[in-house]
């Protein structure tokens, strides 16, 4: 075959795009023209999707792979090389000097020579010669080995290129698949996918470009080497083999690992459009709503923490009012940033159930919190009823609104924000719960600690031994102070020591109790409840709802303990003041009195079992003190709170106190009927007390020139003692009337003492206790109103060796002194003794003067008992203090009779009530004068229990001392 024919055939198998030899040939299915795959792909990708020859639409997948074309091109190349080789071989493979065929290879010179040059040329004398064919074969073998390596390298690169192409194709297919799924989604998602695709393609195209460049370099190198092998003669090939090998070595210097590329994953996030969240809004009474012309809001729709609602103008909004129905969608709560949401507003056709007739408007808008988007001209108002959207029977319009995030991504973002808000709120709640638990634990520990460290409740716990020890300690302290009356320095030091000890103890306890969260109002309400008798006893407290009120009950009991300690401190100070104020009196009388005080204190502490057993006289005092608005006196009678709480509490007005009292009364247990009855009776006593005060004022004004009333007064006292013997278990009403009579008796003592002042043969003896008690009797706001009266009644028999009461001590009888300070229970009994006689006289309807005349009298010679003279300071000059200094003979007894039961006997219901004997009135008179009786003789009251003593029940003895 000649050269021309081979060239014509080669033109057929030439690419019509690059006009070069076909590489990876492809066939156009329309015009059947052959072209390189790389050329046609670049054309279709970068230019236009049509064949460059026939202009027919063309895609890469439509090209036909012509595998046979590669074999044809190789054969044509072989034919062309063969023809060229034969022609050049005849001309080039000859010696230049001898024009002979080169047949010898000089090993020394590394040169191909002919046989003449080797034999006769003289240039290669002594050189080593080898046959040219043998050397040629060796070089061809080496070259072929390198060519094989390069081919293997080329195949690897081609496989990598194909893998990258397959990767690119997979990425394109994945992209096309995702695009088909999300074709109807928003443009934002498509742009995001295109951006992801572009980034991945840049990476892949960069990888492919580097691999393609390396492939083209190797192909050109191979073509050059093959051309040299075919075109060069043996000698030329041998001479150029070193250069070819150097080129091969340079290619091998770049390792194959540098061409291994990381595959780009063909994954594109599938962001499918979420479904709508919908709600229905029924506008009832649409005609009425149109007349109002106000917007109507639908119930909120909660979606992923977002709050949507429909805002409807039934009569239109703005310029379209009266013509169109205006409907808007409002985002009332959500993310603070602006976000786009798709919404749909649908008006239901009510004439038929055909959904296709519903009016649907949908759009996507950027919403901010509080912003509305919608349609000002949603539908004409005049066509609502005609078109069937307004139900004429029900006068209703049904609107359905739907909203959604444009993508799941945005919906997930909203949910994440909502979850964050919920977690923050939950964390806050958990923190608050933990804080409350810590506070509860601290309060429980403080309450337990205060219960362990607080002093025992001496007034509420009769079985508490510590109370007896505390009382004994105070009695011993009183003995020491009374015995050392003249030494005021020692008295003051002992008093300060005791006050410091009590103060430290109270401050420690108050610090443990109130170092935190005690509310002043709550403390004051608890105080009001306690003072009004609304606090439950220990037994009733135990049966209450302990699960809810455990802490409150413990706190209340702890406060009661502290306040009773304060009250004990005040009692100790009172006795210390009495002891320090009377150094001029006989000090030996205080020794026996203090012993009796100690014993009385022990029995008194065992007499009170709960707050319900508080002495009724103290409760009656409360009413009197409330009128005076005296908080100090009020808390002096009852346990009072710590000093730190006293100042803000004392600043309250009376109105605030009454309001707080009423607010605190709801805490009163339902089973405290007895306290309610006591309150009612105290109110009655209060009214009667006012009348008695008026009567006393009249008596005081009319008795300025009264005669000697010693015998009459003494008889009245005996009548009071007799009445007291019959009233051991009297009710609160009787006790109230007893209190009413105190001031009257005190005035009688004052008047008689004034008349007998000049007739007293004995020097005046100062009685601090009597003075102090009488001062409290004259002042209605003080605590112990008639203590001086009781003590004056009992003074005057130093020689009496008989025990005046079950609770009096022999030592007190031996030293019988007017300075004996009786315990509270004995004082209350004496108050009861003083009151009955005057109450009987007052309520019998007699005038004030006649009441005084008809009091029970005793003869001056009855059992030798007499009352000599009383000295008293000028009442007019010292009207505020009302101090009385009675002077009694040494024969006066300092203790009451055994027939008179003490107040502790009444409260504790002891056996004294069962052992009472009834005697005559004369016997009662005999029992009053104890100087002539033997020590073992007991006299009792002749009046039975439970009867009211009237004027007719008393004995009136006329004597020379009973005159006016």
UniProtKB/Swiss-Prot annotation:
Induction, per UniProt: Overexpressed in a number of breast cancer cell lines.
Tissues in which the protein is found: Ubiquitous. Highly expressed in testis, while it is weakly expressed in other tissues.
Chain intervals annotated as zinc finger (RING-type): 15-55
Outcome (variant: residue 18 to R): Abolishes ability to monoubiquitinate 'Lys-119' of histone H2A (H2AK119Ub)
Record region (Disordered): 477-513, 530-554, 640-663, 752-812, 891-964
Subunit architecture: Associates with the PRC2/EED-EZH2 complex.
Keywords: Acetylation, Chromosome, Coiled coil, Cytoplasm, Dwarfism, Membrane, Metal-binding, Peroxisome, Phosphoprotein, Proto-oncogene, Repressor, Transcription, Transferase, Ubl conjugation, Ubl conjugation pathway, Zinc, Zinc-finger
Transmembrane segments: none
Task of the protein: E3 ubiquitin-protein ligase required to prevent centriole reduplication. Probably acts by ubiquitinating positive regulators of centriole reduplication. Mediates monoubiquitination of 'Lys-119' of histone H2A (H2AK119Ub), a specific tag for epigenetic transcriptional repression: associates with some Polycomb group (PcG) multiprotein PRC2-like complex and mediates repression of target genes.
Lineage: Eukaryota, Metazoa, Chordata, Craniata, Vertebrata
Note: Acts as a proto-oncogene via its ability to monoubiquinate 'Lys-119' of histone H2A (H2AK119Ub): overexpressed in a number of breast cancers and promotes transformation of cells by mediating silencing of tumor suppressor genes.
Binding site for Zn(2+): 95, 98, 117, 124
SUPFAM superfamilies reported in the protein's UniProt record: B-box zinc-binding domain, RING/U-box, TRAF domain-like
One GO process term, biological-process aspect: negative regulation of NF-kappaB transcription factor activity
Modified-residue entries (Phosphoserine), positions: 454
Residue numbers of N-acetylmethionine PTMs: 1
Zinc finger (B box-type): 90-132
PROSITE patterns reported for this sequence: MATH, ZF_BBOX, ZF_RING_2
Name of the protein in question: E3 ubiquitin-protein ligase TRIM37
């Amino acid at each position: 075959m000649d050269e021309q024919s081979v060239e014509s055939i080669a033109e057929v198998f030439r690419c019509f795009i690059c006009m070069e030899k076909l590489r990876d040939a492809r066939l156009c299915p329309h015009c059947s023209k052959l072209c390189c795959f790389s050329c046609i792909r670049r054309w279709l990708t970068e230019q236009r999707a049509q064949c460059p020859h026939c202009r027919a639409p063309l895609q890469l997948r439509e090209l036909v792979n012509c595998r046979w074309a590669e074999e044809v091109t190789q054969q044509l190349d072989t034919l062309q090389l063969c023809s060229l080789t034969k022609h050049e071989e005849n001309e080039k493979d000859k010696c230049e000097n001898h024009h002979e065929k080169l047949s010898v290879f000089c090993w020394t010179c590394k040169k191909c020579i002919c046989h003449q040059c080797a034999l006769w040329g003289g240039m290669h004398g002594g050189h080593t010669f080898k046959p040219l064919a043998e050397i040629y074969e060796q070089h061809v073998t080496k070259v072929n080995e390198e060519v094989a390596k390069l081919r293997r390298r080329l195949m690897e690169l081609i496989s990598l290129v194909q893998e990258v192409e397959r990767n690119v194709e997979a990425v394109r297919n994945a992209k096309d698949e995702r695009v088909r799924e999300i074709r109807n989604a928003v443009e934002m998602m498509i742009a995001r996918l295109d951006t992801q695709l572009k980034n991945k393609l840049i990476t892949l195209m960069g990888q492919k470009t580097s691999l393609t460049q390396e492939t083209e370099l190797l192909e050109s190198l191979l073509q050059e080497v093959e051309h040299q092998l075919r075109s060069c003669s043996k000698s030329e090939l041998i001479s150029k083999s070193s250069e070819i090998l150097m080129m091969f070595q340079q290619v091998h210097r770049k390792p194959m690992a540098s061409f291994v590329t990381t595959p780009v994953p063909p994954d594109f996030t599938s962001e499918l459009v979420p479904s709508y969240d919908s709600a229905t809004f029924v506008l009832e009474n649409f005609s009425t709503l149109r007349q109002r012309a106000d917007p109507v809001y639908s119930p909120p729709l909660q979606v992923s923490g977002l709050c949507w609602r429909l805002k409807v103008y039934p009569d239109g909004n703005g310029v379209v009012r009266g013509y169109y129905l205006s409907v808007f969608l409002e985002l009332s709560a959500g993310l603070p940033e602006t976000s786009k949401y798709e919404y749909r507003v649908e008006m239901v056709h009510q004439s038929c159930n055909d959904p296709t007739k519903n009016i649907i408007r949908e759009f996507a808008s950027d919403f901010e919190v509080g912003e509305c988007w919608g349609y000002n001209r949603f539908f004409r108002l005049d066509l609502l009823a005609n078109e069937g959207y307004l139900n004429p029977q029900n006068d209703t319009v049904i609107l359905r609104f739907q909203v959604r995030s444009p993508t799941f991504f945005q919906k997930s973002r909203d949910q994440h924000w909502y979850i964050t808000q919920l977690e923050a709120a939950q964390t806050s709640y958990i923190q608050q719960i933990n804080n409350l638990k810590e506070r509860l634990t601290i309060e429980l520990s403080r309450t337990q600690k205060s219960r362990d460290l607080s002093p025992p409740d001496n007034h509420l716990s009769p079985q508490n031994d510590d109370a007896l020890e505390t009382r004994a300690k105070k009695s011993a302290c009183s003995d020491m102070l009374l015995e050392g009356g003249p030494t005021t320095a020692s008295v003051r030091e002992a008093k300060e020591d005791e006050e410091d000890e009590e103060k430290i103890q109270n401050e420690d306890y108050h610090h443990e109790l109130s170092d935190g969260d005690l509310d002043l109002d709550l403390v004051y309400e608890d105080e009001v409840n306690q003072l009004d008798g609304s606090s439950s006893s220990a037994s009733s407290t135990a049966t209450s709802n302990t699960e809810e009120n455990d802490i409150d009950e413990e706190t209340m009991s702890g406060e009661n303990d502290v306040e009773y300690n304060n009250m004990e401190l005040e009692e100790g100070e009172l006795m210390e003041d009495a002891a320090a104020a009377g150094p001029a009196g006989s000090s030996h009388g205080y020794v026996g009195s203090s012993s009796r005080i100690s014993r009385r204190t022990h029995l008194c502490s065992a007499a009170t079992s709960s707050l319900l057993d508080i002495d009724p006289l103290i409760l009656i005092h409360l009413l009197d003190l409330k009128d005076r608005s005296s908080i100090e006196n009020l808390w002096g009678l009852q346990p009072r709170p710590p000093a730190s709480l006293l100042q803000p509490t004392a600043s309250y007005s009376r109105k605030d106190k009454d309001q707080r009292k009423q607010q605190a009364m709801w805490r009163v247990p339902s089973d405290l009927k007895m306290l309610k009855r006591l309150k009612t009776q105290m109110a009655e006593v209060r009214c009667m007390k006012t009348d008695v005060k008026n009567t006393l004022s009249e008596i005081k004004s009319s008795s300025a020139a009264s005669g000697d009333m010693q015998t009459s007064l003494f008889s009245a006292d005996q009548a009071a003692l007799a009445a007291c013997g019959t009233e051991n278990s009297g009710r609160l009403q009787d006790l109230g009337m007893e209190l009413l009579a105190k001031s009257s008796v005190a005035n009688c003592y004052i008047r008689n003492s004034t008349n007998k002042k000049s007739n007293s043969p004995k020097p005046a003896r100062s009685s601090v206790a009597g003075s102090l008690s009488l001062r409290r009797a004259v002042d209605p706001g003080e605590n112990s109103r008639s203590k001086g009266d009781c003590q004056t009644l009992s003074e005057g028999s130093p020689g009496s060796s008989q025990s005046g009461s079950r609770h009096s001590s022999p030592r007190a009888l031996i030293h019988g002194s007017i300075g004996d300070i009786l315990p509270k229970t004995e004082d209350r009994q004496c108050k009861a003794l003083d009151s009955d006689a005057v109450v009987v006289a007052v309520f019998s309807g007699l005038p004030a003067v006649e009441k005084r005349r008809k009091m029970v009298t005793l003869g001056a010679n009855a059992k030798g008992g007499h009352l000599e003279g009383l000295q008293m300071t000028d009442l007019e000059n010292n009207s505020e203090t009302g101090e009385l200094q009675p002077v009694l003979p040494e024969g006066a007894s300092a203790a009451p009779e055994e027939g008179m039961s003490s107040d502790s006997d009444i409260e504790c219901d002891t056996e004294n009530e069962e052992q009472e004997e009834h005697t005559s009135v004369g016997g009662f008179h005999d029992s009053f004068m104890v100087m002539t009786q033997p020590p073992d003789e007991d006299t009792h009251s002749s009046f039975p229990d439970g009867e009211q003593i009237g004027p007719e029940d008393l004995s009136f003895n006329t004597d020379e001392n009973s005159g006016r």
